[in-house]
Amino acid sequence: MDKPFYLKQFALHQGNTAQRVGTDALLLGAWPFVHTLPEKAHILDVGAGTGIVSLMMAQRFSDAVVEAWEVEDGALKDATTNFAASPFADRLRIHSQDYLHAKREQWHPFDLIIS
């Protein structure tokens, strides 16, 4: 059974992937709290896993749009579920995308790229 991992404003489901929430994801997600971004920032999360860092970015930067790329099917499924269930669903995008094979038109200016 997939028991959610609860954070401040959202719950994270991770039952379809082998990559579980770890300290590194929580630290990476907390790091931008010491930084500022422009209004309506555009953030890219490469290798998003279950979406925890993307969700933390959306929580921290209330008007940012976060694009997440993930290639592993289970993680992609979990991230899709987590994004849809979050209060930030309208600002989160998940794509089955590989960084190495991204097409030029998929690259537009990002204010922050995390991985």
Residue ranges and their predicted role:
Residues 1-36:
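Class I SAM-dependent transferase core
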